[in-house]
Amino acid sequence: MNQQKSLTLIVALTTSYGIGRSNSLPWKLKKEISYFKRVTSFVPTFDSFESMNVVLMGRKTWESIPLQFRPLKGRINVVITRNESLDLGNGIHSAKSLDHALELLYRTYGSESSVQINRIFVIGGAQLYKAAMDHPKLDRIMATIIYKDIHCDVFFPLKFRDKEWSSVWKKEKHSDLESWVGTKVPHGKINEDGFDYEFEMWTRDL
């Protein structure tokens, strides 16, 4: 694994930056879940070796995933936790911190490994998002913006869409989002179960 590989954060959040309530998502959007799976699973087919993406998550995020969907299939799952006795099952990596997780990936999926890493995604929760936003390798946010005022008790740590951060974070064109994702993505607002939401991609220079 190339130690210069960047990090991508993927998150669904309200316009007031709410991301959760009572250790779960306060919305259930099947199309958004499908988008998350496509984005975090996509690997270019022209690679001559087997490649996989990584999903990094905190313990609470891991535990919030229904048992039948754990681990997230077709992706390398890494759980950030200080609980060394946590039983994650075979093939699931654990690490004490974001940097420790990256070191583990460098060691495990080096040039001699039969599996190479394509992209590294940070998928939550709030504490890991904060660590990722502070990390020098984080250069991309795949954001699902939910246009509904929903009560949340957990919030994203940085208001990257606000004017005060416009010199750092830039919203990319939809065509660039599709190019990066590798497939067609609905443009503009989507309505599902009374929720309007939209897919965006934001980047910053490293």
Curated annotation (Swiss-Prot):
GO biological process: dihydrofolate metabolic process; folic acid metabolic process; one-carbon metabolic process; tetrahydrofolate biosynthetic process
PANTHER family per UniProt: DIHYDROFOLATE REDUCTASE
Pathway of action: Cofactor biosynthesis; tetrahydrofolate biosynthesis; 5,6,7,8-tetrahydrofolate from 7,8-dihydrofolate: step 1/1
GO molecular-function terms, A-Z: dihydrofolate reductase activity; NADP binding
Pfam families reported for this sequence: DHFR_1
Tagged with keyword GTP-binding: no
Assigned keywords, A-Z: NADP, One-carbon metabolism, Oxidoreductase
Domain called DHFR: residue spans: 6-204
Superkingdom, natural source: Eukaryota
Reaction it catalyzes: (6S)-5,6,7,8-tetrahydrofolate + NADP(+) = 7,8-dihydrofolate + NADPH + H(+)
Documented EC number(s): 1.5.1.3
Protein name as annotated: Dihydrofolate reductase
Function: Key enzyme in folate metabolism. Catalyzes an essential reaction for de novo glycine and purine synthesis, and for DNA precursor synthesis.
NADP found in the keyword field: yes
Binding annotation for NADP(+): 12, 18-24, 59-61, 81-83, 124-131
Family: Belongs to the dihydrofolate reductase family.
Binding-site list for substrate: E32, I33, S34, Y35, F36, K37, R75
GO cellular component, one term: mitochondrion
